[in-house]
Every structure is written in C-alpha cells, then in structure tokens.
Swiss-Prot record:
This is APO protein 1, chloroplastic. The keyword Chloroplast applies. Residues 1-47 form a transit peptide. GO terms for molecular function: RNA binding. Involved in the stable assembly of several 4Fe-4S cluster-containing complexes of chloroplasts. May participate in 4Fe-4S cofactor incorporation into psaA and/or psaB during translation. Belongs to the APO family. Residues 155-240, 329-414 form the APO domain. It comes from the Eukaryota. Expressed at low level. Expressed at higher level in leaves. Expressed at lower level in roots, stems, siliques and flowers. The APO repeats may provide ligands for 4Fe-4S centers. Disulfide bonds: none annotated.
C-alpha cells in the first residue's frame, strides 16, 4: 500500500519510484491500493504500476485562535428601543434545548448535575477576584469624586444624557417626556457622580437559594449596589451584609430544589453608625463630595490614571464573576437581581407591564447591565465650541468615566480609541456640507 496526498480526486495514475518518498508533516494522507507490477504492459497505461485513490472525506480544518486586529473606527453603541424587549444574550433555541434536557432528566428521576457556584458552594479561585473588585470599587468612587471637583460634567434633567465639557452640547437628541416642547434640545444641569456611575441596585439576600422575595415582603430586604451583592455572594465578608456559606451542595431535579439544607434565619446585624465616615459608606456614592476634597493640581494626573486602572479592573473582575455566578436582568427595565432566579416584586413599569401584572421578565444579565458604561460624546477640547448636530457623524463616543480621566491626564486604553474616533479631523460646518 502507498500513502497518497489528499490533493488527488477519484482515480489517479502515478508511477512508483524506488526512491524513498518524503511526506509533509502538515498534510493528511489516506490509504490506497497498488496494482502489482506483474500486470502486462498492454493492460496498464503505466510501465511500473497504477495507484487508485478511493473516495476520501474532506477533513475539517482545525480552528485557530483569531488574532486581535485593531480597527480604525467602530460603530457607536446602539440605543435599544423601549417599546421592545431586550434581545436574549443566549439564543432562545439554546435555552429551550437545555430546558428540554433538564425536563427529560427530571422525568427519568435523575438529579441535575450542578457545579460550584450553581450548587451553592463557593469557588475558591474567585474569592480573591471578588476582593479585588471591592477594593478597586472603593478606589474608583474616591478617585471619581475627586476628579469631579476639577472636570465639569453636565446632565440632562429630562433624560439620562451626560456631557463632559464646560458647556452642554447642541445635539438635539433628547428623548425626555417634554422633548417636543424643546425640539429635542437638552435641559442641562450640573452632573453628579450618579450620572457617571449609574447606580444599579439589587436586593441583598442572606440565602440566594432560599425563599423568593415576594411583593409583600420587599421592604424586609435592603437594596445595595448589584456589584457589591455579586462580590458578597462570591466570598467577600462584610459584617453588615452577612451571607450564608454552605458546606453541603444543594440538589435539584429539573427546576425543583429537592434539598437546600433547610431554611436559616438571617442573623442579627451589628449596629453601625450612619455617618459618612463609616467603612460601609465607602461602598456607596452617597455624600462623596463631602468626604473627598478637591485634589491639588500636581496630583490630578496620578489620580486620573489610578481611577482609570481601577475602572478597568472592576469591569474585568465583574466579567470573570458573571461567567460563573448567575445574575438576572429584566428584559424591559433596568432591574437587576443577583441570584439563581429573579424575585417576584411587581414594580416593572415599562413596555406591556399591564400584561405581566408588573412582574419582571427575567433573563441572563450582561456586564453592561450590572456595570453600565454610560457613553458620552467625545470632546477634544473642554473649552472649545459646543458640539453641533450637523457634525455628529464625525464625533466619537466613550464611557463617561474614561472621558473624565482622559481630560485629567490619564492614558486612554487601546480598546476605546476606535470608538472615540481620535484619527478623524472634525471639519467646519461649511466643509461638512461639501463632503460627498
């Protein structure tokens, strides 16, 4: 037998050379049959022999890791319509297929195989990640509060638009309730830290796998930042917000929990002072301007770079935690719940909430829903002319915190430069009219 390169198709005639054949290490070969050389010359077209290559299946090419190629410009983040449900992060067919498998196993009486943290146990490798997220979250709040004393920030009182400059822009894209009276112009007021770091809160639960939060019992649970609640369930110990640490995994059959280790009552919380100097106040943005004074001009670039690095570390840490821990988000509003399933509080007032009796439409959450970036228009000069609507196609966007840190002297991460469109020269109004 002779090995033949896969380049052959059907029947291939080849003379056999007595010399050794060098085969390529990258190519694939198939087994073929050789006709003996004793065949008479009149019955064979070749003198030494004939090789037949049979049907060979095409081998699938091995997948290689794609190299990151930096693009010149990327599209601006889309604005999702409010009269439609958010798209599912996971394809709906895949969700249905997994549900059918779980239902089939439940009908056969087979328990669902759960890995940490889906079974209520901690993941030891993610505990340091959660600690780093909390530490960088505190540093992020402190640095941003100091930079807001230096960099001017404006927010629209009618919608959620934010602008980083000495004056507000003139782009008429306000979607507030009275935008028709102002012809789409924004109503600018002085911005706060909550306009840059959008507060996303969730209910703190002592046992995420315990009883669900009902509409009547919603006031028995505290509301804390969803990012902090995610870190607490990942292993961060905060005495004011205790969390149950299981030693035995829970057992599920389909969607039903058959063994959760019983219900435990939440222990009494230690009494803490409500002053702004308490350790718990460092996790919240309430009263940050009173806690942190304006920085000196020499420290501004250093604080800006530390704040930028903390922002990237927080986002990276939240991404790692959400790959393992379940976080649910409403498909219609901005409500977020950290836990294996959502709560039953009827406070959704968005699209078609009457049909759902105010209940939330839970689906898997994205990182931008737990830690929203809040994109703003990129301004190259804070003291320059305000942005106009007829030149908006030449403007870029960036997260509000990145824009503030950049104007304070921090280096812009590479992944934001394409969206900011730093390589585009913004023309004058008359030059823009002549552009084809």
């Amino acid at each position: 037998m002779l090995l033949v390169s896969p380049a052959c198709r059907g029947v291939y005639l080849q003379t056999i050379d007595p010399k050794p054949i060098d085969f390529s290490a990258r190519a694939s070969y198939a087994l073929c049959f050789q006709i003996p050389t004793s065949i008479p010359k009149r019955e064979c077209l070749m003198r030494l022999g004939t090789v037949f290559c049979f049907n060979q299946k095409h081998r699938e090419q091995t997948s290689f890791k794609k190299r990151y190629v930096s693009t010149q410009n990327v599209d601006l983040p889309p604005i999702l319509p409010k009269n439609k449900k958010k798209p599912y992060p996971i394809p709906f067919k895949q969700i249905q297929e997994e549900a059918r498998k779980d239902k089939k196993l439940a009908q056969m009486g087979i328990e669902k195989q759960l890995d940490p943290p889906k079974n209520g146990l901690l993941v030891p490798n993610l505990v340091p990640v959660a600690d780093q997220v909390i530490d960088n979250w505190k540093l992020l709040i402190k640095g941003l509060a100091q930079l807001l004393h230096v960099v001017p920030v404006f927010a629209c009182s009618e919608c959620g638009a934010v602008h980083v400059a000495n004056v507000g822009h003139n782009i008429r894209d306000c979607n507030g309730p009275t935008n028709s009276q102002r012809r789409g112009s924004h109503s600018w007021v002085k911005g706060t830290i909550n306009d840059v770091l959008i507060p996303v809160e969730s209910y703190h639960m002592y046992d995420p796998f315990g009883r669900r939060i009902k509409h009547e019992t919603r006031f028995e649970y505290e509301r804390i930042p969803a990012l902090v609640e995610l870190c607490i369930q990942a292993g961060v110990e905060i005495p004011e917000y205790p969390c149950r640490r299981r030693t035995q995994p829970i057992r599920m059959m389909g969607k039903r929990v058959i063994d959760r280790g019983g219900y435990h009552k939440e222990p009494e919380k230690p009494q803490t002072s409500s002053s702004l100097s308490s350790p718990l106040a460092e996790l919240d943005t309430l009263g940050v301007f009173e806690r942190y004074p304006p920085p000196t001009p020499e420290d501004i670039p250093k604080i800006a770079q530390e704040t930028m690095d903390a922002y990237e570390k927080v986002r990276l840490g939240v991404t790692k935690l959400m790959r393992k821990f379940t976080v649910k988000a409403c498909g219609y509003c901005s409500e977020v719940h950290v836990g294996p399933w959502g709560h039953s509080v009827k406070l959704c007032g968005e699209f078609k909430h009457q049909w759902r009796d105010g209940k939330h439409g839970w689906q898997d959450a994205l990182v931008d829903e737990v830690f929203p970036p809040n994109y703003v228009w990129h301004v190259r000069d804070l003291k320059g002319n305000p942005l106009t609507g007829n030149l908006r196609r030449f403007y870029g966007k960036a997260p509000a915190l990145v824009e503030i840190c950049m104007h304070s002297g921090a280096r812009v991460p590479q992944r934001y430069k394409a969206m900011m469109r730093l390589d585009i020269i913004v023309p004058d109004s008359q030059e823009a009219d002549m552009v084809a």
